[in-house]
Amino acid sequence: MHITEIAKVVEQVRKTNPLVHNITNVVVTNFTANGLLALGASPVMAYAKEEVAEMASIAGALVLNMGTLRPDEVEAMLIAGKAANQQHVPVLFDPVGAGATLYRTEVARHIPNEIKLAMIRGNAAEIANVIHEKWEIKGVDAGTGNGDSVAIATKAANKLGTVAVITGKEDIVTDGKRTVIIRNGHPILTKVTGTGCLLTSVMGAFVAVEQDYVKAAVAALTFYGVAAEIAASKTVDQGPGSFQVEFLNQLANVTVSDIEQYGKAEEVR
């Protein structure tokens, strides 16, 4: 998968301005909307069960994020996801904190059983817990533990019949056959709440314009990581507040040539 080919997906997102329907959490809603707008996508946050089916049906992609979990939101996710499936709208799922509590884990396992997913994205612990693999987790952001992340991602892709993405120091994308590792990004991303949730929504924008979901995921991760690296370089010693603002700027400003120059994506099988 050549880096130039990956970079061109960014141009397609900006040219197409895809509508991304987000059922996400209250902590990250504003940041997610601003990030998608900066990228060039069109965000909508619609949660009411009375309208989610209609909204999901006209979207380019549907993103389900269970960060601040409530029963009414779970119901809305299921309604929206099934409507999206009927209209062949790709559905992305971010199982935030799967493994942290029994209820959260039950929901994280139930949604993929009810909805056909185009993609699932989380840290290693979250993805492992979704597919009943042992991996310790502490809180909703814990991704460290003992295990083989590539093996977990591959098992998830095969078991769920989807593209599985595990993010961390290195990002892994696999459909069970093709596996790509992306080595872009910056540690300061972990100091700004919502950067993982925004990433899943950004991936939704890429999936909306690229039917090869492995390529879409790799393109989104590479783009996102390069934007973070450039933003970090421009805000050295200024802290996470300045980084957050500059990161939004870079989501708007990163070019194809930036991705070609700094992108680090390697297909390992």
Swiss-Prot record:
Q: List UniProt keywords, sorted A-Z.
A: ATP-binding, Kinase, Magnesium, Metal-binding, Nucleotide-binding, Thiamine biosynthesis, Transferase
Tell me the domain of life. Bacteria
Q: Which residues bind ATP?
A: R121, T167
Q: Name one GO biological process term.
A: thiamine biosynthetic process
Binding positions for substrate? M45, G194
Classification via Pfam families: HK
Q: Which reaction does it catalyse?
A: 5-(2-hydroxyethyl)-4-methylthiazole + ATP = 4-methyl-5-(2-phosphooxyethyl)-thiazole + ADP + H(+)
Task: Name the needed cofactors.
Answer: Mg(2+)
| Broad EC category | transferase
Its Enzyme Commission number(s) read 2.7.1.50
Is-annotated flag, keyword Plastid?
A: no
Give GO MF terms, alphabetically: ATP binding; hydroxyethylthiazole kinase activity; magnesium ion binding
InterPro entries, alphabetized = Hyethyz_kinase, Ribokinase-like
> Would the keyword Transit peptide turn up in this protein's UniProt record?
no
Q: In which pathway does it act?
A: Cofactor biosynthesis; thiamine diphosphate biosynthesis; 4-methyl-5-(2-phosphoethyl)-thiazole from 5-(2-hydroxyethyl)-4-methylthiazole: step 1/1
Q: Which NCBIfam families match?
A: PRK09355.1 (NF006830), thiM (TIGR00694)
What does the UniProt record say this protein does? Catalyzes the phosphorylation of the hydroxyl group of 4-methyl-5-beta-hydroxyethylthiazole (THZ).
HAMAP family the record matches: Thz_kinase (MF_00228)
Name the protein family. Belongs to the Thz kinase family.
User: Under which name does UniProt file this protein?
Assistant: Hydroxyethylthiazole kinase
Organism the protein comes from: Bacillus cytotoxicus (strain DSM 22905 / CIP 110041 / 391-98 / NVH 391-98)
Report the gene name.
thiM
